[in-house]
């Protein structure tokens, strides 16, 4: 299983996201054309994302909605970042 935490660079993270989108698309037995139509994203954008890992945030969100993964975005940046052990202890 690919986790984003295992990745080291922005390019690695983008590649992992593109791979996940491709896998989810194939699990749902959708062609690139079908997913692009369902998401309202150009076919070229989807192909570029799956091949070159380049996509706008807006298009990525549209693909996520079309694939039923939009709730994953609610988790993004939702956890509080701690800068010291004392901050963790103070919350208890």
List PLM regions with ranges:
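Short, basic-rich loop-to-helix N-cap that marks the start of a DNA-contacting helix
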Residues: 52-65
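Helix-turn-helix DNA-binding elements, focusing on the entry/boundary residues of the two helices
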Residues: 21, 32, 43, 57-60
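Short, charged recognition helix plus adjacent turn
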Residues: 3, 74-92
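Short alpha-helical DNA-recognition segment
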Residues: 29-47
């Amino acid at each position: 299983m690919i986790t984003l935490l295992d990745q080291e660079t922005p390019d690695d993270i983008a590649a992992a996201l593109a791979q996940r989108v491709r896998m989810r698309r194939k699990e749902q037995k959708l062609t690139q054309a079908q997913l692009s139509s369902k998401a309202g994203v150009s076919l070229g954008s989807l192909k570029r994302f799956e091949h070159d890992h380049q996509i706008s945030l807006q298009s990525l969100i549209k693909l996520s909605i079309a694939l039923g993964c939009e709730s994953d975005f609610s988790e993004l940046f939702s956890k509080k970042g701690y800068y010291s052990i004392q901050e963790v202890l103070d919350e208890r």
